[in-house]
């Protein structure tokens, strides 16, 4: 019964979501507080807002999902929200993930039962401008009242559907997953140039970014820290 209620409730939201000024204000407050907590009120919280426009000049990935500015959330109107919902929220534009103590057959049966009556919508064809090849370095230095200096580097990589996507995923683990990873072993433990360092991928559908982020140890300049990271990347290419 609970499984049926779960799927039914989600289909009901897609079919006839309750829009009102009151519900919008409640959710607006939630998102604005999340924006403040994650992006404005903690050290390095706005790194994504600073890095994305450097990496993307044409592609919409230059916009953080939560918005570029708090005013974008504060000024959203009920009409805009409704238009967005009815443009994109449709069974022919959705992926339903079902996990738990339920068989495949039952999941299909319940999905067909509750989503089968939700009408299709004319979803616009996804045709986003592709990011042109980056031909020069883009760099930004920001001075803030933060506990430690931090270094953030990003390299363009393939999209999620490209076979090499999994190569980048494994590469990020080779560089920073665990104490024996290259960056941790060489730059944190042996040379003690960083107190912490991490490598990860963005996981984007379109061409994404390969990130390296670290906090240099006390007394280590950002220039020395960056040079050490580049040396490790060169070693990785040659070995």
What are these regions (language model features)?
Residues 9, 26, 30, 46, ...:
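Extracytoplasmic/secreted proteins, especially bacterial periplasmic and envelope-associated proteins
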Residues 57-58, 62, 90-91, 95-159, ...:
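An aromatic/glycine/proline-enriched structural segment found at the starts
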Residues 60, 82-86, 138-142, 197-202:
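Short beta-strand/turn micro-motifs at beta-sheet edges
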């Amino acid at each position: 019964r609970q499984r049926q209620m779960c799927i039914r409730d989600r289909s009901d939201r897609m079919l006839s979501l309750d829009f009102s000024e009151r519900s919008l204000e409640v959710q607006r407050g939630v998102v604005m507080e999340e924006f403040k907590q994650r992006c404005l009120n903690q050290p390095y919280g706005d790194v994504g807002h600073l890095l994305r426009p450097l990496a993307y000049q044409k592609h919409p990935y230059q916009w953080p999902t939560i918005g570029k500015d708090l005013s974008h959330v504060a000024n959203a109107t009920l009409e805009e929200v409704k238009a967005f919902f009815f443009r994109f929220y449709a069974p022919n534009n959705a992926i339903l993930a079902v996990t738990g103590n339920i068989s495949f057959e039952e999941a299909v049966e319940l999905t067909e039962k509750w989503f089968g009556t939700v009408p299709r919508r004319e979803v616009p064809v996804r045709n986003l401008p592709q990011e042109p090849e980056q031909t020069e370095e883009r760099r930004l230095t920001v001075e803030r009242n933060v506990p430690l200096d931090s270094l953030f580097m990003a390299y363009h990589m393939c999209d999620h559907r490209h076979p090499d996507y999994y190569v980048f995923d494994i590469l990020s683990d080779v560089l920073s997953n665990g104490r024996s990873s290259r960056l941790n072993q060489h730059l944190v433990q042996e040379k003690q140039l960083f107190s912490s360092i991490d490598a990860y991928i963005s996981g984007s559908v379109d061409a994404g970014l390969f990130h390296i982020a670290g906090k240099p140890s006390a007394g280590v300049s950002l220039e020395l820290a960056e040079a050490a990271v580049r040396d490790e990347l060169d070693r990785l290419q040659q070995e």
